[in-house]
Amino acid sequence: MKLENTLFTLGALGSISAALVIPNLENAADHHELINKEDHHERPRKVEFTKDDDEEPSDSEDKEHGKFHKKGRKGQDKESPEFNGKRASGSHGSAHEGGKGMKPKHESSNDDDNDDKKKKPHHKGGCHENKVEEKKMKGKKVKGKKHHEKTLEKGRHHNRLAPLVSTAQFNPDAISKIIPNRYIIVFKRGAPQEEIDFHKENVQQAQLQSVENLSAEDAFFISTKDTSLSTSEAGGIQDSFNIDNLFSGYIGYFTQEIVDLIRQNPLVDFVERDSIVEATEFDTQNSAPWGLARISHRERLNLGSFNKYLYDDDAGRGVTSYVIDTGVNINHKDFEKRAIWGKTIPLNDEDLDGNGHGTHCAGTIASKHYGVAKNANVVAVKVLRSNGSGTMSDVVKGVEYAAKAHQKEAQEKKKGFKGSTANMSLGGGKSPALDLAVNAAVEVGIHFAVAAGNENQDACNTSPASADKAITVGASTLSDDRAYFSNWGKCVDVFAPGLNILSTYIGSDDATATLSGTSMASPHVAGLLTYFLSLQPGSDSEFFELGQDSLTPQQLKKKLIHYSTKDILFDIPEDTPNVLIYNGGGQDLSAFWNDTKKSHSSGFKQELNMDEFIGSKTDLIFDQVRDILDKLNII
């Protein structure tokens, strides 16, 4: 099956190198997009955006507000549904692509009612006022017409298309991952809900009418017959999302004609082609859980410390951590009944982790033996199928679920609830929709960790690593090197252990596995966010602003980064922060809560007991052993 939209893979593995730079996405509709419509299915297309607020309609456009005509091949006007409706603030714009675009007609006068009526086309579907009633009688269609003039704000025009974005436009390898005719539509922040509902209703009607003229063998129906993704062969809106009115939109299958019209609506920020998200294989081998030990020591590990995790045994209590992944083996003994199933997003999939990746990540966050915060609650949010694949839109829906579940728990104000964290060890090509979803989830209060990716490239080229409000995590090794696969760059915030990490797995209630990747590094940070949240001082302490109940994600992100160990890692590019996370070593955290000036370096000193003193003297031997093991590819 040929697929059409953006690639996503689990952060533990290799994925596609692709960048998409969109200036000022919050006002993406204010940028002009140049797209070669004729060949957009055959090869990636270059999209350019230029600020042009004063652009006037072209000479080829008639001037009559809110009316759209599509020229047929023989020059006749083909009627098209209108999406703006009388509640919209402006009329639609030109959609000229390859000479076949939809043309808006702008009113030249509002005074001559008779002339105006002569100019008005009859619309098929579209809005309530211009609805065409169709009846089938004896195999023939009889069309009734009901037409009312629309009221649009005088003098305002929507002359530019909302951007159509796709990683495949910038990386040919991603074309095979695009899902044909399936799109994620994102509204501008603050778009009125009444107008959104009106727009969606019209889109649904127009899509149903759009497929009436298609033959049963049309390629559109090939994509919509995939019952693992589609709920209707006719297509249309399948699902919607809304995170506290900060990030909203809908998902569905649409013909090209309807996509063109959707992009003309002033409510729409951008349209993104949906795509397949995949997990690839990863190495499994026996190893010790050195990662926990590393984040609890500032100095380099030695034979006396490499397997010692220093922590507060109350860490994690009162915090809920959402694992947005392949699911979680919630019956694993190491979760001690603190793990529950939240939601399965993929259509017709089962409530279990048939892959293992999500269970492994959850174990690093909160399991008894392998977790950073050993008392936290875990919620499984399945966005990838048991075979390790899913869609970008399902990932967006998973983020929405976590955000709403957090808001509900926070509003209930249950005794002992201290906040929510989330981990998403996914990575792939740039997706504005996913980045905005993650940022919106952070804005409503979730402390978010995401994997930097495993392509040894600039993390800013991938999503959700480029979501600026999350904490983006690169992977380090036992020898304090940047892992050879780990992405880098200014979008990386911190590093955490990510090579040969032992954690919980699937197959039984006590299964374990050792995996590698930034997918394994990110849960260390999600666990550490959970750790600090659970141990935060009371709201009446000096650490909080007056009236504040808990640290905001922005505040905790800043403190976590500042408290981390600086300049201790090797092979870190110049534009990449040399920062390794640190949990405080199980000691008093007053320095963490108070610390706003002092930077912590690898020269941190503390009083050593006898065991630690002896261990420190073995550093040289340990380094030599490590070099030998490194050469044998054992570590």
UniProtKB/Swiss-Prot annotation:
Molecular function GO terms recorded: serine-type endopeptidase activity
Active-site residues annotated for this sequence: D325 (charge relay system), H357 (charge relay system), S519 (charge relay system)
Localization, UniProt: Vacuole
Superkingdom in the source lineage: Eukaryota
Disulphide bridges, residue numbers: C460-C491
Induction: Repressed by glucose.
Catalytic activity line of the entry: Hydrolysis of proteins with broad specificity, and of Bz-Arg-OEt > Ac-Tyr-OEt. Does not hydrolyze peptide amides
UniProt entry keywords in alphabetical sequence: Amyloid, Disulfide bond, Glycoprotein, Hydrolase, Prion, Protease, Serine protease, Signal, Vacuole, Zymogen
Broad class of the protein's primary localization: other
GO-annotated cellular components: extracellular space; fungal-type vacuole; fungal-type vacuole lumen
Pfam families linked to this entry: Inhibitor_I9, Peptidase_S8
PTM characteristics: Activated by N- and C-terminal proteolytic cleavage. Protease B (PrB/PRB1) processing requires at least 4 cleavages. First, the signal peptide is removed from the 76 kDa preproprotease B by signal peptidase in the ER. Then, PrB removes its own Pro-region (in trans) at the N-terminus, producing a 39 kDa form before exiting the ER. In the Golgi complex, the C-terminal Post-region of the 40 kDa proprotease B undergoes protease A (PrA/PEP4)-mediated processing to a 37 kDa intermediate, which in turn is quickly processed again by PrB in trans to yield the 31 kDa mature PrB.
PANTHER family assigned: CEREVISIN-RELATED (PTHR43806:SF11), PEPTIDASE S8 (PTHR43806)
Note: [beta] is the prion form of PrB. In contrast to other prions, [beta] is not the result of a conformational change of the cellular PrB, but distinguishes itself by autoactivation in trans. Usually, PrB is already involved in its own maturation, but PrA plays a critical role. PrpA mutants lack PrB. However, in growth conditions that favor PRB1 expression, PrB activity persists in PrA mutants due to autocleavage of PrB in trans. This condition is stably transmitted to daughter cells in mitosis. [beta] can be cured by growing in PRB1-repressing conditions. Present with 1600 molecules/cell in log phase SD medium.
Recorded family membership: Belongs to the peptidase S8 family.
Protein name per UniProt: Cerevisin
Gene this chain is encoded by: PRB1
